[in-house]
């Protein structure tokens, strides 16, 4: 993202888009449309939260209400529990969308590749919105992009290191490291498949909370934590 290059006109367009989404009669949508709708809503709200507080070095600097995730993960801050907008007369937070709607209702671990938390360690924010027609293809594309990038998984002399997403949400990936490995192999390209072949478990996990800002000079991963 190039947050510093977003114009006032662009911000107004984003506000109008969010207003349009907030006025949608969600119950009138079929399940596939709802799935795409909530992904787009989450990502647009995240971008707005960053733009409203930019410049910041990390989304964790935006102290609006923390997160459902433990404070040792998020630093106890962030915008995730703040009620940022109303949908159908009900105030909604980012955590509501991810943990009370998307994950429990759709039960698809590819959600973790679709929702973007504005950090270098998170999956890529695709340039186009999700639609009912494109949903499955875009979810698969997002999964492959992440699994086949060092942000998702990498190997070195110490063993196999994966994104902390697979630790935080391990229950969504089979409930153990073997389930995570099976998931990774499902979306791995030939090179990643070969890299994964020697491993039967995961050595460490890592996550980079730096803002996914193209203006940032650093794009390095943080030191891994033990898995």
PLM feature spans:
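Interaction/scaffold regions that mediate signaling and macromolecular assembly across diverse proteins
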Residues: 1-227
